[in-house]
Each structure stands twice: as C-alpha cells, then as structure tokens.
Amino acid sequence: VNSPSINQNAPEPLAEIEKRVLWLSTAMIHHANRVRPNPSGLKVGGHQASCASMVSIMTSLWFGQLRSGDRVSVKPHAAPVLHGINYLLGELDESYLTTLREFGGLQSYPSRSKDPDPVDYSTGSVGIGATTPIWGAIARRYVDASLGGAGTGRQYSLVGDAELDEGAVWEAVLDHSVAEQGEIVWIVDLNRQSLDRVVPNIAATRLERMFSGAGWQVITVKFGALLESLFTRPGGTALRERILDMPNPEYQRLLRCTADEVRLRLPGDAADADAITSLINDLDDATVLEAIRNLGGHDLDALREAYAQIDDTRPTVIIAYTIKGRGLPTQGHPQNHSSLLTTEQYEILAAELGMDPSKPWERFEADGPSGRICAEPLSAWLARRWSI
C-alpha cells in the first residue's frame, strides 16, 4: 500500500485539521457500511474516494477563506466532508455521525431540508449544484435592490469534473448576464476519473479556453510545492514536461506503484529521460511517492494563493488538479469511485492519521492550536446561518 499522508510538510495546525476532516468523512461512511447493522449486506452508500479528493479544497475554504456572507454549493458526493467540517466547528452533534443514510440521519448529498447541520444549497443531480449559486447570486442582488439588507459575499460552487459534461452547466456559463457576476467562484475538482474509469482524454486546456471565452477568469492550480521545487533542479524542466504530456491512465497507474517502479516508469523514453532519472534517483522513497502525488488541489498554500488571485469583477473558475482518493489506500485506483475501504485498509488509514478506530469521533482539544482554529470561524458561521 502506497498512501503517504496528505500534506506532510504543510504548516501545522491546519494540516492536522485537514487530516481529521479526511478521517471523519471516511469514518462516517465506514460506520454506515461496515459497523452499523446491515442485514442485507448491500452497500448503504457514501463515496470515500470522492470525499478524499475534496478534503484539501474544503479545508482551505472553511478554515481560511470563507466569510460570513459567502455561500457554498458542495459537490454531492462530498457531503460527508461537509458534515465532518460542521462537526469540528461545533455545528453538528456527535450523535449524527453514525447516521449517514439512516432514516432521519445525515444525507449522502447535502440537503437544506433534511440535514441537521448548516447547508447552503441542496445538491444531488449532477449539474444542479454547480449552477444553483448563480441563481442565488441573482436572487440576492434582486432582494438587495428591492428591499435592501441582502448582504454581500461570494457564491462558491465545488464542482466535480464529470459535472462539466452536463449541458445545463454550459448554458449557465454562456449566459451573458453571468459574465457580470463577480461574486461567482467555481472550484473544479479535476481528478480525471468518472465513475469506475479514468477519463482518457479529458483536456483541461480546452475547459480553460471555454471558460475564458465566456468571460470568466481562469486560475489553474496544477502542482504543489514539492513538485514546483523539483522543477527548479537539474532535470526539473524535463520532469515537468513529462508529467504535463503524460496520458491520464499512465499517470493514474503511477499512483499505485512502489517507489522503485516509479523510478523505472516515470522517466519515459524521450530524449531527456536520463535527466529525469538522475533527478529522481537522488530522492528517497518517501519523497518519490509524495512527489508523484503532489498536485495543487491538495496543497493548502497553492490553494490559498489561488484564492488571493480572484478577480471580483467577473466570475472565476479555479481548476484544481486532484487525485481521487487522495490519502486513502485506494487513491488513484480506476475503480475506487464507489468502493469502500476494507476493515484492514481502514485500520491502516487510522494508524497513518494517528487515530483510534475505537474512538473515531474525537475532536481537537479546545485550547490546542487546531482546536482554536476550529473555534475562530464559529461566531461568523453562526451569523451566516441566520443571515439571508
């Protein structure tokens, strides 16, 4: 199993919160399917890999970016991540964490009417969650112009890359009035997997051109700090071009390789392969494995830098490169979309994250660094829950 911990070099304590969010979202789904009595033996629900690809993005938003007037539409399969964050913020009672997809319990898709914790937009059918904040922005502008007091704030959509196959998405993007809505920010979870396959020909550059042509600001978060550092070394330019030119299935296969296998496969057979070989042969095994996974959508600093570039005079799309299942033993596997961790894999993950499977719902100490960060946004969060 090759699953280095996420953001090993990220500043504490935000990285600890990120790890805890990954654990909580995974544990909720594990409990619903493997712990709670289930006479039928059928899968109850939940998508651990889809949650994992969103953990860094949502951690960086909730614990460093969002303000009280902001609203967020969360991609449907990332609902357990939202529940985990709300739990850490004190907005969800522990008793609900064992109720995912139970009658009267937590929903597997965010629901304003059924979930007990704060949800800005109900999402479910693909495409709806992406576009709903556009209509929310229009409604807020109308209320403010007519009655006043509607407040201000950005409208974020967290979008799975496969949702961009939906025609309704592009109907909204191309609407001329949307180009004037600077409060709209979409963050695309570009993990290049759809259902149980690796999408072979997904072209991020084409998506960038389509958004740009509609008048949107396009920000691409492709690589994390480790890879960016390696690119500055001898052989780094060749490594960068090799990764950029690599077909999606080949890249996904590298995620399931040992360090020695990565050293063998990664250089390829181009003229500058020897330069790549020399570069990665100087790295220890842990660094080799971390480097091949070091995409921008899992780098908290890279995401923070992207948010700082948002232009509030026009809509923005942030295309964040991610790995489906990042941090899990199943990361990058082409059939991990609806798969569940085995009990053994779950215990391995617990050990990697420093968690006790017998006490899965532990919060941070209130007076510790991570606990204080969780408490800081709470007053603003309570205010936004009751505002328009």
Tell me the role of every PLM-derived stretch.
Residues 153, 180-184, 215:
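Short glycine-/polar-rich loops that comprise or flank the Walker A/P-loop
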Residues 71-75, 183-191:
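Short internal beta-strands
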Residues 1-60, 163, 167-168, 185, ...:
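Conserved acidic/glycine
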Residues 9-21, 25-42, 48-179, 200:
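Cofactor-binding active-site loop characterized by glycine-rich and histidine/acidic residues
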